[in-house]
């Protein structure tokens, strides 16, 4: 989000093939027409669709010119707290805080106006009534360090993150992984690690790619967010 600190607000709304809330889409289009020079506006596919060509075709068919972020792991959607298809988020890229979460028609424009005016903004949260966005978060409510996390570290990280390795620190114990867990979450979410990642959704498949699977990313990030617990 810091990449958009030259804008005074960022507005994000969920989008899915045949599941997008019509009122939300209309409100986002109106916001784009009025604020596109001052506000960054995005649609977010919360892991509902993997076919990017189909998403692009639906946008073109409906004459929508908003960019779509593909949240294949659903993790960004979770962190923004978007749970229904009619909920949008208005984000302040300077303070890194959410100013508004709720239906686009109820308060998004007011939040944008407040940010444009430079006013101090406190979070306004209004429950949406649209279709619930499915999530597998409950499947990872009791992750085991031994069975779920350590194998991912061993397979994808430990070759470099070991004593004498080329990485700046070793992941050679559960305590070390716990201590570095906030950094692990950051570099996994931003895809800086594992190094040399390739967008495997574009072009031909490439052998020996370094990417984590969506499931591995979900487990690591959700484990860290749960406090990085270790099996007793």
Describe each region flagged by the PLM:
Residues 1-10, 141-148:
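A short beta-strand-turn-helix
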Residues 1, 14-28, 47-49, 131-134, ...:
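Short, thiol/selenol-centered motifs that function as redox-active sites or metal-ligating centers
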Residues 18-62, 72-78:
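Structural microenvironment flanking redox-active thiols in thiol-disulfide oxidoreductases
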Residues 123-232:
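Aromatic- and Gly/Pro-enriched helix-to-coil junctions and flexible linker segments
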Residues 7-10, 36-41, 64-66, 85-86, ...:
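Loop/turn elements at helix/coil->beta-strand transitions in domains of secreted/extracellular proteins
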Residues 58-85, 89-91, 97-98:
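Short, internal strand/loop/helix patches
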Residues 92-93, 97-143:
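Thiol-/selenol-based redox modules, centered on thioredoxin-like
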Residues 3-23, 42, 112:
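Short active-site neighborhood of thiol/selenol oxidoreductases, capturing the structured segment around
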């Amino acid at each position: 989000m810091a990449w958009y600190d030259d804008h005074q607000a960022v507005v994000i709304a969920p989008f899915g093939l045949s599941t997008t809330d019509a009122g939300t889409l209309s409100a986002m289009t109106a916001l784009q027409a009025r604020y596109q020079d001052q506000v960054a506006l995005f649609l977010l596919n919360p892991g509902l669709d993997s076919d990017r060509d189909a998403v692009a075709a639906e946008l073109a068919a409906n004459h929508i010119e908003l960019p779509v972020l593909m949240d294949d792991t659903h993790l960004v959607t979770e962190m923004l707290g978007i749970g229904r298809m009619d909920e949008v988020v208005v984000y302040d890229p300077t303070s890194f805080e959410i100013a508004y979460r709720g239906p686009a028609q109820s308060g998004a424009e007011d939040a944008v106006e407040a940010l444009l005016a430079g006013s101090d903004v406190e979070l306004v949260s209004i429950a949406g009534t649209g279709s619930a966005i499915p999530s597998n978060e409950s499947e990872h409510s009791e992750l085991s360090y031994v069975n779920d996390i350590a194998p991912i570290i061993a397979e994808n990280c430990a070759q470099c993150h070991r004593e004498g390795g080329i990485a700046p620190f070793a992941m050679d114990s559960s305590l070390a992984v716990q201590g570095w867990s906030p950094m692990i979450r950051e570099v996994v979410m931003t895809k800086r690690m594992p190094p040399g990642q390739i967008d495997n959704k574009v072009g031909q498949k490439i052998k020996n790619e370094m990417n984590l699977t969506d499931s591995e990313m979900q487990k690591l990030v959700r484990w860290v967010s749960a406090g990085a617990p270790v099996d007793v």
